[in-house]
């Protein structure tokens, strides 16, 4: 036995359809915005990195995507502020990576506390 659909149910269904359509549109706009920003970033990186340095960054991105994203943003900021010579060569990128690695090693401290047996 099926219950008759009331006007309120139809109204609710329409409201849910509209909400779903709005959410889908918002997600699509966000996806387009992210794609556009990524395209702009790639364009900037093509200018500030030599092909070899770009390849190294691509390799890093495959292994550590979050680190690569952070590194890309830092490189772009350094280049735009004029604090680094452009284009960045592979050797210069290696030096930057070594500096970051040293800094991370200094930040990483292991504390060992001895506890007595009781």
Curated annotation (Swiss-Prot):
The keyword DNA-binding applies. GO terms for molecular function: DNA binding. GO terms for cellular component: cytosol. Gene3D superfamilies: PDCD5-like. The keyword DNA-binding applies. Keywords: DNA-binding. It holds the Pfam family dsDNA_bind. NCBIfam families: PRK04239.1 (NF003268). Belongs to the PDCD5 family. PANTHER family: PROGRAMMED CELL DEATH PROTEIN 5 (PTHR10840:SF0). This is DNA-binding protein LS215_1892. It comes from Saccharolobus islandicus (strain L.S.2.15 / Lassen #1) (Sulfolobus islandicus). The lineage of its organism: Archaea, Thermoproteota, Thermoprotei, Sulfolobales, Sulfolobaceae.
């Amino acid at each position: 036995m099926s219950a008759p659909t009331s006007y309120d149910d139809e109204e609710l269904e329409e409201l849910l359809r509209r909400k779903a359509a709005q959410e889908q549109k918002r997600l699509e706009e966000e996806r387009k915005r992210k794609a556009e920003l990524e395209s702009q970033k790639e364009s900037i990186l093509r200018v500030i990195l030599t092909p070899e340095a770009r390849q190294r960054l691509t390799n890093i991105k495959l292994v550590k995507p979050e680190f690569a994203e952070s590194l890309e943003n830092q490189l772009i900021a350094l280049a735009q502020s004029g604090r680094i010579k452009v284009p960045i060569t592979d050797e210069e990128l290696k030096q930057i990576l070594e500096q970051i690695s040293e800094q991370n090693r200094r930040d990483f401290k292991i504390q060992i506390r001895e506890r007595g047996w009781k």
